[in-house]
Amino acid sequence: MLIYQDAKNIHTVTLDDCRNSIEEFVAVARYHAKVKFTEGFRKRVSASRKSLEATIASGAGVYGVNTGFGDNVRYRISEDEMVQLQENILRSHGCSVGRILTEEEARALMLMQLMSIGKGYSAVRLEMLEQIRVFLNEGLYPYAPCEGTIGGLSFQPYIAVTYIGEGRLIENGVPCPAAEVLKLHGIKPLSIKAREGLALLSNASHSIGVGLLAVYDFIMTMRHADLCAALVCEALRSTDKAYDPRLIQLKNHKDTSETAEFLCKVLNGSEIMNESRTLRVQDSMNTRIIPHVHGAAKRMVTQTYDALMEELNAVFDNPVFLADGTALMGSNWDATTIELYCDSLAIAVMDVAKLTEVHVERLVDPHLSGLPAFLVKNPGLNNGYMILQYVTAGLLADIALLASPAACFNAAVSAGQESPIYRDDTAARQLYAAVQKLRRMVSMTMMTA
């Protein structure tokens, strides 16, 4: 089932090994559930910080600790400049413009920071994670423009600087200086230390967080879409002939079979359907293919769920620090998996939306449905659902654009040092937007059916 409880009914989420469920994630990001740390979480983070001290003492070159960032990795940073280096990256990298992150997007990003860094390989102080936890529990909402970014690199700093009392927080719907808002809430600004600025940016926090919100919503939407499809079958006087288990099992698709079984169960005993069995030899394709379209989308969301849950439980920092003080530098932050699965699921969303729009179009067309034109008394004088069908067509067009793969783009950045680029953030945001539009389309179909 993937989702076993309603996220809004979860009021407290405890972070221990940070292997939490998608429902718990949504509970914090969307419904403001409180976050708690276990003692094991605290000890693990504190131990990780000690490994950094050993690394610095060794004098070894470590990316982003005693070197510059990106192509500036060639420049060594002295120990007395290490704190300034971290402050600089937070202040210099916040360059995105345009649309502001929604509150649940910002909260999802902050929660991902806790869950990733909290695994104990990022060598930050516990105080930094406590600050993020306080932000979540107090409902503080950073002001973060998010357009014009590669990954989240140019808008995550807008959030991170609020931890140190800079930038802006949205208070009562108005962007206000972070220092003033923190004072109002009795929160002391964090003093950033060596390594900590990069740890807040070297990740895929936003794309994983928004991707999980989209997956959660799509799973819930498909439950409603199945029920809605049963109503459509009745309204169009279709039958369940195409859902015969003897036929469906030959397709050998588990999700298709389960969808067909659900439709048969819901439609069992329907007087309308029983009366319709002799109307035609074969129903229109738009009702026959419901289990196949919905089943394929469910398979894709299951695969995306699995991929994003792996990312949720991953360490994607760079560098990472082992208990013996060894610093390992690589690309665990790489977001190819997020990018590809979010792109693919957006295409599945579009496929469901295509079928949904066809159902509305047939329901309001008297020549196809046999029902009053636009489902209203006195058509001509009254317009009924005429324009509602226009809206579903417009939403479908929007979803088609959002389903264009974000992965099909590249550019050179940081003097070629950090190329190719990945558009995981764009892919996740497009998926999220597509799912919200599909939710509205399903609601409109329910109205017409």
Feature map (PLM): residue ranges:
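Active-site cavity-forming subdomains of large catalytic enzyme subunits
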Residues: G94-T102, A106-H253
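Glycine-rich loop at the start of a catalytic domain that most often binds anionic cofactors/ligands
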Residues: D71-Q86
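Short beta-alpha connecting loops at secondary-structure transitions
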Residues: H11, G209, P245-Q249, M329-G330, ...
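Accessory "access/gating" subregions that flank catalytic or transport cores
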Residues: C233-K354
